[in-house]
Regions:
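Amphipathic alpha-helical packing elements
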Residues: 47-89
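Polar/charged low-complexity regulatory segments
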Residues: 3-49, 110-152
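Amphipathic protein-protein interaction modules
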Residues: 72, 76-129
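Broad hydrophobic/π-residue packing in well-ordered secondary structure
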Residues: 31-32, 61-65, 69, 93, ...
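Short coil/turn linker and secondary-structure boundary residues
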Residues: 2, 30, 53-56, 67, ...
Length: 152
């Protein structure tokens, strides 16, 4: 059952701050914590310029786990905290093999733009010059967000 008041207490105001890095884990998955932040902000409308869905980062997580954006949003809407959301993510993921999850996490951490889908590469071609400092090189996909949001 949705509990937007509880969601508001957990939500970061993304008009004033950044979501967590895609490198931060939730439930053993990179990208998970960032998805939670963006979804929690989306529900009460304090997501600013951040999209919960569609999002290429979230798409990677949802594709790997087999969880849909709507399923994730329904759980977040209950006011689930990080621990509860992590437990749900672990239980609902189609991937239960810990070694496969570790390998996927490492693949995501090392993912280069040239390895991304063509539409993501095209999007990043315009996005990076607008939002990433020109003197900072992007080595892997996660760098785009960590540079833009001043974590690197």
């Amino acid at each position: 059952m949705p509990d937007l008041e509880k969601v508001r207490t957990l939500a970061k105001d993304l008009t004033k701050t950044y979501p967590r890095s895609p490198r931060e884990m939730l439930g053993g998955y990179v990208i998970g914590a960032r998805c939670a932040d963006k979804c929690r902000a989306f529900l009460p409308g304090i997501n600013g310029d951040y999209n919960y869905w569609p999002c290429s980062l979230a798409g990677l997580l949802f594709s790997f786990t087999g969880i849909t954006p709507e399923q994730f949003k329904e759980v977040v809407a209950t006011g689930a905290n990080d621990e509860e959301l992590a437990a749900w993510l672990k239980a609902q993921s189609k991937v239960q093999d810990q070694q496969a999850i570790i390998q996927w996490n490492n693949k995501m951490r090392d993912l280069r733009l040239s390895e991304m889908a063509p539409q993501v590469q095209a999007y990043m071609e315009d996005y990076i010059p607008k939002y990433v400092p020109s003197h900072r090189p992007v080595y892997v996909y996660f760098d785009v967000y960590d540079l833009e949001e001043k974590r690197l």
